[in-house]
Amino acid sequence: MSYRRELEKYRDLDEDEILGGLTEEELRTLENELDELDPDNALLPAGLRQKDQTTKAPTGPFRREELLDHLEKQAKEFKDREDLVPYTGEKRGKVWVPKQKPMDPVLESVTLEPELEEALANASDAELCDIAAILGMHTLMSNQQYYQALGSSSIVNKEGLNSVIKPTQYKPVPDEEPNATDVEETLERIKNNDPKLEEVNLNNIRNIPIPTLKAYAEALKENSYVKKFSIVGTRSNDPVAFALAEMLKVNKVLKTLNVESNFISGAGILRLVEALPYNTSLVELKIDNQSQPLGNKVEMEIVSMLEKNATLLKFGYHFTQQGPRLRASNAMMNNNDLVRKRRLADLTGPIIPKCRSGV
């Protein structure tokens, strides 16, 4: 308590007033003591770490004109360094001659028969439109002449002109229909273990509450028929991923799980992958395109878990680094190779698989 009372005396002191009352000698002493406390000046801004070096006494009077005259005289007295190879004035190489630009050919004036010249000179805009349509020369007349002739409604051949500017008619493409899955009804069917329900697709249904998605995960623990479960673009987050991870530890029927395009972080994705050793039925897992990147550490842990799993055949995620990407690809290739060997063993006999490296 006595130490705190001593500090109370210095609480209301004005540091600027104290520094302003110090002499130059006292300021230098204070600066030296601060240098001992902080030799690298890490507590000072970068612009204040260098000591003041402009307080030196001048060595003599400064006269600008005399200094310039001295520098000019010194520059004139200094001899230039002689060239190692003296310049003889000999010219080498070819003299550069600019290339002549090619002359544009002059178009000769076309002379028509007097009857044609007279006919064209006296032709109206509508007749010029007909001639342009027949010859296919639609630049023969300006737009103003064309629209004036079109307004006079005296053009005979309108198809030849209109067919050039007619736009291409594209077939209208309808928007994708919204997902018509009844969320509550599907949840009840999962809870009732409906044998006809083998695929649950809740993709792009954005108004599903988080407790409802967690209820889906709880219902899938006891379900024996659902093989595909997809919740792409449903705004699912980490609590949903944690519930799905607990479901994977119990469920023995689900084969495909798709949680792409959601708000699951690296912790949620890692919980899903850590549940794979407890599940022997899942063959496809898609986790790509989340709201935030997983990071290199999470990717390395995911690859380590994939290398220890022998049942997963497809893993949907684009690794950012080449090392984890190659390791995950090799793990999936080895798992598919094991499935192929088991299938051949059922047909021809047992085949002893090779040991997987790094497992």
Swiss-Prot record:
Q: Does the keyword Cytoplasm apply?
A: yes
Source organism phylogeny:
Eukaryota, Metazoa, Chordata, Craniata, Vertebrata
One GO term of the biological process aspect: pointed-end actin filament capping
Q: What is this protein called?
A: Tropomodulin-1
The record describes its quaternary structure and partners as: Binds to the N-terminus of tropomyosin and to actin. Interacts with FLII.
Q: Which GO terms describe its molecular function?
A: actin binding; tropomyosin binding
One GO location term (cellular component): actin filament
Q: Where is this region: Tropomyosin-binding?
A: 39-138
Please provide the record's keywords in A-Z order: Actin-binding, Cytoplasm, Cytoskeleton
Query: Annotated region Disordered: where?
Result: 39-61
Where is this chain's protein located in or outside the cell?
A: Cytoplasm, Cytoskeleton
Q: What is this protein's function per UniProt? A: Blocks the elongation and depolymerization of the actin filaments at the pointed end. The Tmod/TM complex contributes to the formation of the short actin protofilament, which in turn defines the geometry of the membrane skeleton. May play an important role in regulating the organization of actin filaments by preferentially binding to a specific tropomyosin isoform at its N-terminus.
**Family membership:** Belongs to the tropomodulin family.
Q: Which organism is it from?
A: Bos taurus
Gene name of the record: TMOD1
